[in-house]
From Swiss-Prot:
This is Uptake hydrogenase small subunit. It comes from the Bacteria. [4Fe-4S] cluster 1 binds at residues 59, 62, 156, 190. Keywords: 3Fe-4S, 4Fe-4S, Cell membrane, Iron, Iron-sulfur, Membrane, Metal-binding, Oxidoreductase, Signal. PANTHER family: HYDROGENASE-1 SMALL CHAIN (PTHR30013:SF6), NIFE / NIFESE HYDROGENASE SMALL SUBUNIT FAMILY MEMBER (PTHR30013). Predicted to be exported by the Tat system. The position of the signal peptide cleavage has not been experimentally proven. Belongs to the [NiFe]/[NiFeSe] hydrogenase small subunit family. It comes from Rubrivivax gelatinosus (Rhodocyclus gelatinosus). Its EC number is 1.12.99.6. It catalyses: H2 + A = AH2. [4Fe-4S] cluster 2 binds at residues 228, 231, 256, 262.
């Protein structure tokens, strides 16, 4: 199988453009310029990796997102970087012909292909709600048997998502509960950001290993910070400036959306840094709060427009009287607590004083 560099040269791409591509790839992955030679070497020497993409219960939004990646472009990822040999949504072949391709790749590249799963397998009724040549739970286990890693695309494969919402009649289940003996990289989101999807694949192909994961199995390079941490509306949150309803003056001023349900403070994703549509925007920038779609169980945690909790802070708009009065109250409470603690400590160290206090009472 050809290397990525050989494919690019065959397509008439110059060495200069190739190195520029490697530099942009390093930037998109958040890597230092010193990694560019490593990326170039990997793309020059390593053959393209076969990818088998299975679909479960889903809406195909992950595929829709993937094909809109700006860097790398989906066409470069599919036609040059990886060898997407099986994807029953995108491939031309169907039926027995498609199944023959799947079997051929599994046998020919045993231990060297990546399994990507979009959607989740249903366990109720022996998996009859999602059937290819066999129920998806068994099909996924069979394809995973000789893969080197599994990528769980989206919140469906990662957590279960809306198919697993209560009462979950199909028993839709995240893929890590069906495939238990392989490393699984979770890329949650409904859907995930396009550049996050292609970035994970690029990292795996470049360094021939899975990216560093957090405790939940998500790549730290994209899921180590809350959306709230880098949100451009964060200064309004800190200042106590909030939208109270979507049609008020504060909404027009671009104030923080926390009080109208934004889940950014509890959601780990790269939306506020990578954004969507080639870095054009993301939901909060468009005026709608984060729904927390990359977090486990978001679909059963109440309305998207309910605030997480009440917060009590002054912000820069608070009056001096309010701040001073509250501060005085806090200081008074602290003095009373300190006095009580001092009495208790003195009595505990002076038995006679304790006896005298008891006799007086």
């Amino acid at each position: 199988m050809e290397t990525f560099y050989e494919v690019m040269r065959r397509q008439g791409i110059s060495r200069r453009s190739f190195l520029k591509y490697c530099s942009l790839t390093a930037t998109s992955l958040g890597l230092a310029p010193s990694f560019v030679p490593q990326i170039a070497h990997a793309m020059e020497t390593k053959p393209r990796t076969p990818v088998l993409w299975l679909h479960g219960l889903e809406c195909t939004c992950c595929s829709e997102s993937f094909i809109r990646s700006a860097h790398p472009l989906a066409k470069d990822a599919v036609l040059s970087m990886i060898s997407l040999d099986y994807d029953d949504t995108l491939m031309a072949a169907a039926g027995h012909q498609a199944e023959a391709i799947l079997d051929e790749i599994m046998a020919k590249y045993k231990g060297n292909y990546i399994l990507a799963v979009e959607g989740n397998p249903p366990l109720n009724e022996d998996g009859m709600f999602c059937i290819q040549r066999q129920a998806l739970p068994r099909e996924a286990q069979a394809v995973a048997a000789d893969c080197k890693a599994v990528i769980a695309w989206g919140s469906c494969a990662s957590w279960g998502c809306v198919q697993a919402a209560k009462p979950n009649p199909t028993q839709a289940t995240p893929i890590h509960k069906v495939i238990t003996d392989k490393p699984i990289i979770k890329v949650p989101g409904c859907p995930p950001i396009a550049e996050v999807m292609t970035g994970v694949i690029t990292y795996m192909l470049t360094f021939d290993r899975i990216p560093e994961l957090d405790r939940q199995g998500r790549p730290k390079m994209f899921y180590s910070q809350r959306i709230h941490d880098k949100c451009y509306r964060r200064p309004h949150f800190d200042a106590g400036q909030f939208v109270e309803s979507f049609d008020d003056e504060n909404a027009r001023k671009g104030f923080c959306l926390y009080k109208v349900g934004c889940k950014g403070p509890t959601t780990y994703n790269a939306c506020s840094t990578v954004m969507w549509n080639e870095g054009t925007s993301f939901p909060i920038k468009a005026g709608h709060g984060c729904t927390g779609c990359s977090e486990d169980g978001f679909w059963d945690k109440g309305s998207f427009y309910d605030r997480l909790t009440n917060i009590h802070q002054f912000g820069i708009e608070a009056s001096a009287d309010k701040v001073g009065g509250t501060a005085a109250g806090v200081v008074g409470a602290a003095i009373a607590a300190h006095a009580a603690a001092s009495v208790i400590k003195r009595l505990s160290h002076d038995p006679d004083a304790a006896a005298r206090a008891e006799s007086r009472s």
